[in-house]
Curated annotation (Swiss-Prot):
Species name: Natranaerobius thermophilus (strain ATCC BAA-1301 / DSM 18059 / JW/NM-WN-LF)
Gene3D superfamilies reported in the protein's UniProt record: FAD/NAD(P)-binding domain (3.50.50.60), GidA associated domain, C-terminal subdomain (1.10.150.570), tRNA uridine 5-carboxymethylaminomethyl modification enzyme MnmG/GidA (1.10.10.1800)
CC annotations in GO: cytosol
Annotated Basic and acidic residues bias: 625-635
Gene Ontology BP, a term: tRNA methylation
Gene: mnmG
Cofactors (names): FAD
PANTHER family, per the entry: GLUCOSE INHIBITED DIVISION PROTEIN A, PROTEIN MTO1 HOMOLOG, MITOCHONDRIAL
Residues where NAD(+) binds: 273-287
Name listed for the protein in its UniProt record: tRNA uridine 5-carboxymethylaminomethyl modification enzyme MnmG
Region Disordered, annotated ranges: 625-644
Subcellular location: Cytoplasm
One annotated GO molecular function: flavin adenine dinucleotide binding
Main location: cytoplasm
Length: 644
C-alpha cells in the first residue's frame, strides 16, 4: 500500500563513505536532507581494509577536509595507528595512512549524522526512482513509501544485485554479511541508465589469540602526532602495532593446486576485478617467479580479536583458505573468524555523468562512490562531497562546482571517470595526476579551503585560521629573503657539516634553503630570533622554496591546459556536421558530449588531428555568431532602435 513519506530538498540513498559526505554537505549548506540506508547499524561501514589514506588516497581525504567534509576528522578521532609513507621520496608522493578502529569509526560518523541540523536518517530499501519529463521527483521504497525531493544522490556502493562467492558456494548478499539490493538495478535499466558488472574481494579475518606475533616483524606507527584534518584536533586513542609476514613456496603450492576450485579461474566470476588490488591467487598466477608476497596483519579495533590479513584477498574455498594461511610464519595455528570472499555487483557507466556527477539526461539525479565504478573509501568520499555540494547548489539556484584536474585529485578522479570511463574498479594513483607536484597532500587546504568557504562548508573560525596560515607562510618567506649570510669560517663549517658547497658571496636564507641538504630547522643556527611557527607552516615554507622552479614550470603547464579547458563546446553541437573528424572521433564525441576542448582531448580514441578539426569548427561558429551579432546591431541602428 502506498504511503507518503514527506518532501525533501535532497535525498541521499546509501550511507557508506560517499553517502555520508553527500548528506552532510547538503544539510550543512542548508538543504532539508533525508538519508536512506539499508541498515542504520552499518553506517560508514569498512567492509574491506580497516584503514584510511595511503598513496593518492590521503590526498583525497585532505581535499575532502579542506572542502569541509567529515572523513578526515572521523579517522583522526578513531585511528589506532598513524604512519607517514614514502618519507624518503618527494613531497608529491608522501602519504599519511591510519589504521582505524572500525567500530568506533562507524559510531562516530553515525553520531555526527544523527546530530546534524537539516538531516534525517531512515532505514529503508529504495526500489524505484520517480522521474517525470527527465526530472527527478523522488524515490519509492520496498515497503511502498513515496519520498519526494528536488535532487537525489545515489551512493549505493556494492549492494546492487550483490553476489557473494566463496569457492563453489555463492549467494545473494552485500559486503560483510549485509543484504543485497535488487530493485534499483532493474529500475535504472527502465530509465536508460547503462550498467556494468564489477567484482572486488576481501581477505579473511583471523583470531588474534591464534597468531604468533614472535614469528612476524612488528611495525609500530609514527610517534609524531599526524592528523588528516586541517581544522580539527583530538587526543589519540591507544595506538596498536601491525605485523609483517610473508607467503612462501608451500603457500603458493596449495594455491596452484587449488586453482580448479577458484571461482576466479573456473569462470564462475563474471565481473571485472580491480587491477591494483588483485587476489592472492591472481598474484601467484601472474607472478610465478616471485618466491614470496608480503602480508600485513592489521588490528580491526581496540576491543576486538579480529585481524585483517592485508595482501591476501581471496575467494578460494574455506578449507583452502585455512590450509594456505597455516603455511605462513606466525599463522601456523590460525583460526579464521570470517572467510575471504569475492563480491560481484552492478555499477553504472560513469560516462553518463557530467563533471558535477549529475546524470546528463535526468536532471537532479546524481551518482557518487562505487556505483560509479570506483574502489576505495576515499574515492567514494571525494565523489560524495562534490555530489552533495552540487545538489545543494542546484537547489539554491547557484552555479555548479567543478574541481579541475589542476585543483585536486578529486578533479582528476571525476574527470577520468566521466571522460574516459573505466573497464575495472578505478583506484586513484599519484601517477594519474599530471600536476602532482602542486597537488600534494600537505597543501590541500591551500588549494580548496577557499572553495569550501564559498559554498558554505568551512566555518568562519576555520576560515580565519586558514587566512592566518597563509599570512604566516608569506611573511616568513619575505623575512628569509631579508636575512643574508656572509661567507666566513663559521658559515663555511656549517655548509661542510651539511655536505653542501660553501658560499661564494652574501646569500639570503631564502636561497640557502633551496639547497636539498639544508632544512628550515637547520637554519635556526643562524636565525635564533625566528618566529615560533607550527610544522604545517614551516613545511609549506620549505617545500615552496625548495621546489619553486619545478612548481613554476607546473603552473605554466596548468595555464596552457586551462586554455583548452576554457574553449567550451556548445551543448547543442552536431558532430555529424563537422567534416574532417574521424568516424571514431565523431561517434565518441556524440556519445560523451564533452563540455570543453580540453575534456574532448582526454577521450580515448580522439587524436590531435580531430582536436584541430574541432577547434577550427568552433572558431568558424564563433565568427559566424560575431557576424550575425554585428548585422543585428547594424539593423537596429538603421531603424533607430538605439536612439535615445
Amino acid at each position: 500500500m502506498a504511503y507518503y513519506g514527506g518532501n525533501y530538498d535532497l535525498i541521499v540513498v546509501g550511507a557508506g563513505h560517499a553517502g555520508c559526505e553527500a548528506a552532510l554537505a547538503g544539510a550543512r549548506i542548508g538543504a532539508k536532507t533525508l538519508l536512506l540506508t539499508l541498515n542504520l547499524d552499518q553506517i560508514a561501514l569498512m567492509p574491506c581494509n580497516p584503514a584510511i589514506g595511503g598513496p593518492a588516497k590521503s590526498h583525497i581525504v585532505r581535499e575532502v577536509d579542506a572542502l569541509g567534509g567529515e572523513m578526515g576528522k572521523n579517522i583522526d578521532d578513531t585511528a589506532i595507528q598513524f604512519r607517514m609513507l614514502n618519507t624518503r621520496k618527494g613531497p608529491a608522493v608522501q602519504a599519511l595512512r591510519a589504521q582505524a578502529d572500525k567500530i568506533k569509526y562507524q559510531e562516530r560518523m553515525k553520531y555526527i549524522l544523527e546530530n546534524e541540523e537539516n538531516l534525517l536518517l531512515k532505514q529503508e530499501t529504495v526500489n524505484q526512482l520517480m522521474i517525470e519529463d527527465n526530472q527527478i521527483k523522488g524515490v519509492v521504497t520496498k515497503d511502498g513509501t513515496y519520498y519526494y525531493c528536488e535532487q537525489l544522490v545515489i551512493t549505493s556502493g556494492t549492494y546492487l544485485k550483490g553476489r557473494i562467492i566463496v569457492g563453489d558456494v555463492d549467494y545473494s548478499g552485500g559486503p560483510n554479511g549485509q543484504q543485497a539490493a535488487y530493485g534499483l538495478s532493474e529500475d535504472f535499466k527502465q530509465h536508460g541508465i547503462s550498467l556494468m558488472r564489477f567484482k572486488t574481494g576481501t581477505p579473511a579475518r583471523v583470531y588474534r589469540k591464534s597468531l604468533n606475533f614472535d614469528e612476524m616483524e612488528i611495525q609500530h606507527g609514527d610517534d609524531y602526532p599526524w592528523r588528516f584534518s586541517f581544522y580539527h584536533s583530538s587526543e589519540r586513542l591507544k595506538q596498536l602495532p601491525c605485523y609483517l609476514t610473508f607467503t612462501n613456496y608451500e603457500t603458493h603450492k596449495i594455491i596452484n593446486d587449488s586453482l580448479s576450485r577458484s571461482p576466479l579461474y573456473s569462470g564462475r566470476i563474471e565481473g571485472t576485478g580491480p587491477r591494483y588490488c588483485p587476489s592472492i591467487e591472481d598474484k601467484i598466477v601472474r607472478f610465478p617467479d616471485k618466491s614470496r608476497h608480503q602480508l600485513f596483519l592489521e588490528p580491526e579495533g581496540l576491543n576486538t580479536q579480529e585481524y585483517y590479513v592485508q595482501g591476501m584477498s581471496t575467494s578460494l574455498p574455506l578449507d583452502v583458505q585455512e590450509r594456505m594461511l597455516r603455511t605462513i610464519p606466525g599463522l601456523e595455528e590460525v583460526e579464521i573468524m570470517r572467510p575471504g570472499y569475492a563480491i560481484e555487483y552492478d555499477c553504472i557507466d560513469p560516462t553518463q555523468l557530467e563533471l558535477t556527477l549529475e546524470h546528463k539526461q535526468i536532471s537532479g539525479l546524481f551518482f557518487a562512490g562505487q556505483i560509479n565504478g570506483t574502489s576505495g573509501y576515499e574515492e567514494a568520499a571525494g565523489q560524495g562531497i562534490l555530489a552533495g555540494i552540487n545538489a545543494a547548489q542546484k537547489i539554491q539556484g547557484k552555479e555548479p562546482v567543478i574541481i579541475k584536474r589542476s585543483q585536486g585529485y578529486i578533479g582528476v578522479l571525476i574527470d577520468d571517470l566521466v571522460t574516459k570511463g573505466t573497464q575495472e574498479p578505478y583506484r586513484m594513483l599519484t601517477s594519474r595526476a599530471e600536476y602532482r607536484l602542486i597537488l600534494r597532500q600537505d597543501n590541500a587546504d591551500l588549494r580548496l579551503t577557499e572553495l569550501g568557504y564559498q559554498v558554505g562548508l568551512i566555518k568562519e573560525g576555520n576560515y580565519q585560521k586558514f587566512k592566518e596560515k597563509l599570512e604566516k607562510i608569506e611573511s616568513e618567506k619575505e623575512r628569509l629573503k631579508s636575512i643574508k649570510l656572509t661567507p666566513n669560517k663559521n658559515v663555511q663549517n656549517f655548509m661542510e657539516e651539511h655536505n653542501t658547497s660553501g658560499l661564494k658571496k652574501p646569500t639570503t636564507l631564502f636561497h640557502i634553503l633551496k639547497r636539498p641538504e639544508i632544512s628550515y630547522e637547520a637554519l635556526e643556527y643562524f636565525d635564533e630570533t625566528r618566529p615560533d611557527l607550527p610544522l604545517e607552516v614551516t613545511e609549506q615554507i620549505e617545500i615552496q622554496i625548495k621546489y619553486e622552479g619545478y612548481i613554476d614550470k607546473q603552473v605554466e603547464q596548468v595555464q596552457r591546459f586551462e586554455k583548452l579547458e576554457a574553449r567550451l563546446i556548445p551543448d547543442d553541437i552536431d558532430y555529424s556536421q563537422i567534416s574532417g573528424l574521424s568516424i571514431e572521433a565523431r561517434e565518441k564525441l556524440q556519445t560523451y558530449r564533452p563540455r570543453s576542448v580540453g575534456q574532448a582531448n582526454r577521450i580515448s580514441g580522439i587524436d590531435p588531428s580531430d582536436i584541430s578539426v574541432l577547434m577550427v569548427y568552433l572558431e568558424q561558429l564563433k565568427q559566424r555568431a560575431d557576424r550575425n551579432q554585428a548585422s543585428h546591431d547594424d539593423s537596429n541602428t538603421e531603424t533607430g532602435e538605439n536612439d535615445d
